[in-house]
A protein has these predicted regions:
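Enriched for short, Lys/Arg-rich terminal
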Residues: 68-106
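Short, surface-exposed coil-to-beta transition loops
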Residues: 60-64
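Arg/Lys-rich, positively charged N-terminal/basic patches that mediate binding to nucleic acids
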Residues: 1-21
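Short polar/acidic secondary-structure junctions
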Residues: 54-56, 67-70
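N-terminal targeting/export leaders
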Residues: 12, 23-29, 37-40, 99
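Amphipathic alpha-helical transducer elements in NTP-driven molecular machines
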Residues: 20-23, 59, 94
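A short, surface-exposed loop/turn module that caps and links secondary-structure elements
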Residues: 28-58
Length: 106
């Protein structure tokens, strides 16, 4: 069983992008495939997964940054954003995510 730990920022934004039903499908998929996302370079193991929304393909969908702690049965959902609004994650945000994940894994 996987427990999802949602950051305050993720919780604030998720319903701007996904319906409850879409979010449920996303969680089921991620629980079954926790290593599916690409590891973001310089993030300390944070992964980015592309997820399509209803009526859009992956390129018009959202990106979710997450950290999988499979040995602890946890997936940390950190950030969700539209592909159209952000080309890449700024370095200072990646650094903050890396520091947070280092703290979590200790």
């Amino acid at each position: 069983m996987v427990t999802f730990v949602e950051s305050p920022l993720f919780m604030k934004q998720v319903h701007d992008y996904l319906t409850d039903a879409e979010y449920g499908v996303f969680q089921e998929y991620l629980a079954a495939n926790p290593d599916m996302g690409d590891v973001v370079r310089g993030s300390g193991g944070v992964r980015k997964i592309r997820w399509s929304r209803r009526g859009t393909g992956k390129s018009g969908g959202v990106r979710v940054l997450y950290f999988a702690r499979t040995e602890a049965g946890q997936i940390w959902l950190l950030l969700i954003y539209a592909k159209s609004s952000v080309d890449s994650i700024p370095g200072h945000i990646l650094k903050a995510l890396k520091e947070e994940m280092e703290h979590v894994t200790k």
